[in-house]
């Protein structure tokens, strides 16, 4: 599916309408477009949400350095995100403390048996963190983007019987042959071609074309030039100006939201505030 530039802009804001909230920018809109194409041919589809959570597909399960990092592994930019808020809001919202409290609460809910090694305990915590937080975000995204197109998407890996069973499977089995979701790959061997079965995991697509960054940067420059947009009521203008020249390696959220997606997300926030008549009071 190929889209013209102006259509990409429209898709990004249509994704906000589908969520009723700002989301994951073009990561959302690409799924929205994908679902609209599928709907031309069928009304029901299957999707793999929850497989990464229960079979250990994410990089933060597999990379020891990321795994050992304190906090939600897909949200390591809380301090950076807080730096965008204007001073008045920042004084009222202690985002760093709030996120840390939710993180600690979730760790305490992890069901860990006595006698487990430090690594085994951490991997069990990671499963719980992903099931309770990251998976919920992806399920909501899939539901919103698909149903906006009247497409029913079913998620078989979310079946309670599978999820409960896999929760207790030791990591060395999930990590079969050192592959992401190795146990799942082995289970369906013979059902899929080997080039599909054993290919390296790839995250859901975002926009990689360099023109996309040019496009969203130009939109942000226009927003800053107008000076009266709702986004500027809550975000520091100078931080938005700095963002246009940044190239951060740590995502704003998840695995894919780097600088172009961060700019696009903030444009979504501005659109959402205008379209939904959002007013901020502190």
Per-region residue spans from a language model:
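ATP-dependent adenylate-handling active sites, centered on carboxylate activation for C-N bond formation
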Residues: 3-6, 10-115, 119-126, 141-192, ...
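Core structural elements
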Residues: 130-138
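A ubiquitous short alpha-helical element
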Residues: 130, 149-153, 225-229
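ATP/NTP-dependent adenylation/nucleotidyl-transfer catalytic domains that generate, transfer
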Residues: 160-161, 217-222, 260
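PAPS-dependent sulfotransferase catalytic core
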Residues: 192-254
């Amino acid at each position: 599916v190929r889209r013209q530039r102006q259509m990409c802009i429209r898709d990004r804001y249509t994704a906000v309408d589908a969520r009723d909230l700002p989301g994951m920018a073009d990561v959302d809109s690409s799924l929205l477009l994908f679902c609209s194409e599928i709907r031309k041919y069928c009304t029901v589809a299957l999707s793999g949400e929850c497989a990464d959570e229960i079979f250990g597909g994410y990089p933060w399960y597999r990379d020891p350095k990321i795994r050992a990092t304190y906090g939600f592994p897909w949200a390591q930019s809380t301090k950076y995100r807080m730096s965008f808020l204007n001073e008045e809001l920042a004084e009222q919202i202690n985002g760093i403390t709030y996120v840390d409290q939710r993180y600690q609460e979730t760790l305490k809910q992890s069901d860990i048996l006595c006698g487990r090694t430090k690594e085994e305990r951490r991997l069990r915590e990671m499963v719980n963190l992903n099931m309770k937080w990251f998976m919920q975000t992806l399920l909501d995204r899939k539901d919103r983007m698909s149903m906006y197109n009247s497409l029913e998407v079913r998620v078989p890996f979310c079946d309670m019987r599978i999820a409960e069973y896999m929760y207790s499977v030791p990591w060395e089995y999930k990590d079969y042959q050192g592959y992401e979701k190795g146990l799942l790959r082995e289970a369906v061997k013979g059902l899929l071609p080997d080039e599909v079965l054993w290919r390296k995991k790839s995250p859901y697509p975002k926009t990689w074309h360099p023109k996309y960054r040019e496009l969203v940067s130009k939109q942000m420059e226009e927003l800053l030039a107008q000076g009266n947009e709702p986004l500027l009521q809550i975000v520091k203008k100078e931080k938005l100006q700095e963002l246009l020249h940044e190239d951060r390696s740590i995502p704003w959220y998840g695995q894919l939201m780097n600088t172009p997606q961060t700019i696009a997300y903030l444009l979504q926030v501005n659109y959402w505030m205008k379209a939904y008549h959002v007013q901020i009071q502190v």
